[in-house]
């Protein structure tokens, strides 16, 4: 089951802007994919770029998941980002806009239901968390954005992608959070106690309520995949 939240923050609301986060998900017989992209506010086509990036990586992982799960981390970063950039360049050429106008972060999780393996891909300042047996842990940290966040159109961005291949093991769910969301969920590099409790119980509807009550400055989004039912069914 996929649970989603994506809302505009107060900054874009006050400036007559738009929510520049984009979510995407898909499933096939063997795979689940969830993805999140956050458009760069200063870019003219940020929302469109985020939508293209999240859709491109979702479709790529669904179609070529078996290959990506056998690649090494460098190959995963290179091939996935090259595909996204190709999609962005096609859109830019069609619209006669600079490709940099379509810049965004992109994060995605590919789950192999049968082999119970997972691939996490993260470019930019989103975070990917796993939940299982009442505990939460970080799978992919956000990049350090103190000197500027690396995005899809950044030169040599593939060198900055965080990739993790792992066994699902005791994981029950996985969640991708935009920076606007996770900054409200963490305090001094630790999950706030109330958020940790929600996550440990896979209470994502309650997490929606928590975030919408925080008066977030930035757009805030998450996409979560609760794997418990599907994995039990595949194990039967």
What is the role of each PLM region?
Residues 1-236:
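PP2C/PPM-type serine/threonine phosphatase catalytic domain
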